[in-house]
Regions:
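Short, flexible active-site-proximal loops enriched in glycine and acidic residues
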Residues: 80-84, 110-115
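Class I S-adenosyl-L-methionine
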Residues: 35-104
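Mixed-charge interfacial surface used for oligomerization/domain docking
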Residues: 3, 9-23, 28, 34, ...
Length: 282
């Protein structure tokens, strides 16, 4: 069976990773002189406290080649083929590191590296689809073809409580135009062509903004594939998250609504109070 691997920016929970037998290659987070591997052990609240205290955003970087090799090696040694997903190449060099790791293992003919053109559970949606296909006995080529068809259909967006983290991180150029005197704005950030861009803008308290954002997605949600939808957030109010879940459930579209928390890398760039609804269009 083809082994499915992703870098850590897919933001899939440990339960989902175990259910679908997915392995993770961690990116790195740098807080001053301290370097951490992205993963469930990262204390997101402490990450934000450090950022606010130091008035800066943690730096993030691609995995090391050694780490990527160590994750892939056992499966190569077993003679298995691998499909490995990376965050959009427009946002990180993670994909290059994974490709170099495959070369170092002399396994280019056994490893397919896919540029998700996305982030967070926008990647996670593709990773889970690939894992389902692998479990169904599909070949590496068949999985790659299926995923290539799905990549442009992924709908990834989120709203943020503060523009500061996106601005400091420099990953969304549109935020620079909003930052001057517009800190009360809560933009809807969408992933398009592998990059982040600002879409519609909301004003008001973040709890109300998040609920309006979810309702504004209704027509798109009605045209989504019904298998699953992700609600992914970072340090969001639990009641607000539950209200979004209840609203999506009330539409009666999805077989599964999966709540996940954004990992360390994604949280470092989006900031606290961020929530996204991510799905695949039909």
């Amino acid at each position: 069976m083809v082994k499915i691997i992703s870098d850590s920016t897919c933001d899939l929970s440990q339960e989902v990773l175990e259910r679908y037998d997915i392995d993770i290659i961690p990116l790195h987070i740098v807080k001053g002189d301290e370097e951490l591997e992205d993963g469930p052990q990262i204390d997101i609240h402490a990450l934000y406290e450090w950022a606010d205290k130091n008035k800066t955003t943690p730096k993030t970087s691609a995995p090391s080649i050694e780490t990527a090799m160590n994750v892939m090696r056992p499966y190569i040694d077993e003679g298995r083929e691998i499909i490995c997903f990376s965050i959009s190449s427009e946002m990180s060099t993670s994909i290059n590191v994974i490709r170099m790791a495959a070369e170092e293992l002399d396994a280019e003919d056994k490893v397919t590296v896919i540029d998700s053109r996305n982030l967070s559970t926008g990647i996670g949606l593709l990773v889970v689809e690939a894992a389902v296909m692998a479990a169904d006995g599909k070949s590496r080529e068949e999985i790659k073809t299926g995923i290539d068809e799905l990549i442009p259909k992924v709908r990834a967006s989120f709203v943020v409580d503060t523009l500061v983290y996106l601005y400091r991180g420099g990953r969304c150029n549109a935020v620079s135009a909003l930052i001057g005197g517009a800190l009360a704005l809560h933009p809807m950030i969408v992933v398009k062509d592998g990059k982040m861009d600002a879409s519609r803008k909301y004003r008001g308290k973040i709890g109300k903004v998040i609920k309006n954002y979810a309702k504004d997605l209704e027509e798109d949600l009605k045209n989504a594939r019904p298998d699953r939808v992700f609600i992914t957030h970072s340090e969001c109010d639990a009641r607000t998250v539950e209200e979004v879940r209840d609203y999506i459930a009330s539409l009666g579209i999805f077989k599964e609504i999966i709540e996940t928390r954004a990992g360390g890398v994604i949280s470092s760039h989006c900031g606290p109070g961020t929530l996204g609804v991510l799905f695949i269009a039909k």
